[in-house]
Amino acid sequence: MKLLTRAGSLSRFYSLKVAPKVKATEAPAGVPPHPQDLEFTRLPNGLVIASLENYAPASRIGLFIKAGSRYENSNNLGTSHLLRLASSLTTKGASSFKITRGIEAVGGKLSVTSTRENMAYTVECLRDDVDILMEFLLNVTTAPEFRRWEVAALQPQLRIDKAVALQNPQAHVIENLHAAAYRNALANSLYCPDYRIGKVTPVELHDYVQNHFTSARMALIGLGVSHPVLKQVAEQFLNIRGGLGLSGAKAKYHGGEIREQNGDSLVHAALVAESAAIGSAEANAFSVLQHVLGAGPHVKRGSNATSSLYQAVAKGVHQPFDVSAFNASYSDSGLFGFYTISQAASAGDVIKAAYNQVKTIAQGNLSNPDVQAAKNKLKAGYLMSVESSEGFLDEVGSQALAAGSYTPPSTVLQQIDAVADADVINAAKKFVSGRKSMAASGNLGHTPFIDEL
């Protein structure tokens, strides 16, 4: 397959005529292609490039950016949510119609996802069409126009998107949990506050992109593409904004409680304490503890009846319930605890029994076989999460932004094996002794407050 490249200025790029053909070299005739090793490059401007040529018929490229909701402030809340919906708006190089029609014409897909830490712009298509979608990806992320009338027309979608997401009580409780646990940064919701819907302006969108979509805050990850070509694209078109951008405030854990009385017969509740930042040895210990307690059913639509949390609660509660450990790690903090779903009348018994089970482990009642079984579950879950191209792309991109490097699965498994039984017990102790945060919704007449635990 012939590699075609064309140089051009930034102004010419906006005409969508100069991006290099992002195509991989074919294997020699008659020789079955073998996937190559992951190639990793960090440019002087801080931009990270990683690629894996797996010779798959479809390619996937993701641009990961440190621009999640934690980087919003009190004056621009909801900006990242609107950006998430604005990927098809007119840019300096293509109209909204051209972007939508161009992607559709080759059977491709452009998606935007975001967490509290990062935003990810991902394109998927047949490998022969990567150059087409790559140009749209670059336009959307480096040359948005945010025309006033297009932004205004998109505002009602914020309310719909939020309403659909928060139909799930678990999503609502998790959002409230972060708001209760933190005073800033990680307290910011993934969804635009109601009072800001209709008020996010094109100027705010431009400022957010200008301050956060910088080279040092980006990672370009490709699967099914050639590393030299991906590197050339990054050097030529993602070097527009230099510098580190706005660093953002460090998350301040404080603890607190948000209760939402709505009369639902099922009570959803989450109780957590601060844990550890992602990538640390302590975070690995909390991950093992999560699987010691029970991270959820391993059979589709199955029960969680074999977990220690479930068994502990079942001894004293005879109404239907569900309970699992909760674990979330971020770049500078983390949350660990458990999540319960129960009948309103038994909510207090379920929460207290689950809390007492963690206290039991904190007192040293933990066997080595239980720890080994938890490690095996954690390792299996991790390996299965990176088995798909989507999961692998997300893992490489997240690591590239967090650490500027990539830790292969073999090393991750060694880090999990290095967790000692005492480390897991200490993690449980940290939860028990730590300042708690709680969020609950439903008929809360029998749901205890934090100080009642």
Swiss-Prot record:
How does this chain sit within the bilayer?
Answer: Peripheral membrane protein
* Complexes and interactors: Component of the ubiquinol-cytochrome c oxidoreductase (cytochrome b-c1 complex, complex III, CIII), a multisubunit enzyme composed of 11 subunits. The complex is composed of 3 respiratory subunits cytochrome b, cytochrome c1 and Rieske protein UQCRFS1, 2 core protein subunits UQCRC1/QCR1 and UQCRC2/QCR2, and 6 low-molecular weight protein subunits UQCRH/QCR6, UQCRB/QCR7, UQCRQ/QCR8, UQCR10/QCR9, UQCR11/QCR10 and subunit 9, the cleavage product of Rieske protein UQCRFS1.
- List every position bearing N6-acetyllysine: 66, 199, 250
Give the UniProt entry's GO cellular component terms.
mitochondrial inner membrane; mitochondrion
Q: Which UniProt keywords apply?
A: Acetylation, Electron transport, Membrane, Mitochondrion, Mitochondrion inner membrane, Respiratory chain, Transit peptide, Transport
Q: Name one Pfam family in it.
A: Peptidase_M16_C
Q: Where in the cell is it found?
A: Mitochondrion inner membrane
- Give the transmembrane ranges: none
Q: Which GO terms describe its biological process?
A: proteolysis
Q: Which family does it belong to?
A: Belongs to the peptidase M16 family. UQCRC2/QCR2 subfamily.
Q: What is the name listed in the Swiss-Prot or TrEMBL entry for this protein?
A: Cytochrome b-c1 complex subunit 2, mitochondrial
Q: What Gene3D superfamilies does the database record attribute to this sequence?
A: Metalloenzyme, LuxS/M16 peptidase-like
Q: Where is the transit peptide?
A: 1-14
A GO molecular function assigned to this protein is:
metal ion binding
Q: What does this protein do?
A: Component of the ubiquinol-cytochrome c oxidoreductase, a multisubunit transmembrane complex that is part of the mitochondrial electron transport chain which drives oxidative phosphorylation.
Q: Which organism is it from?
A: Bos taurus
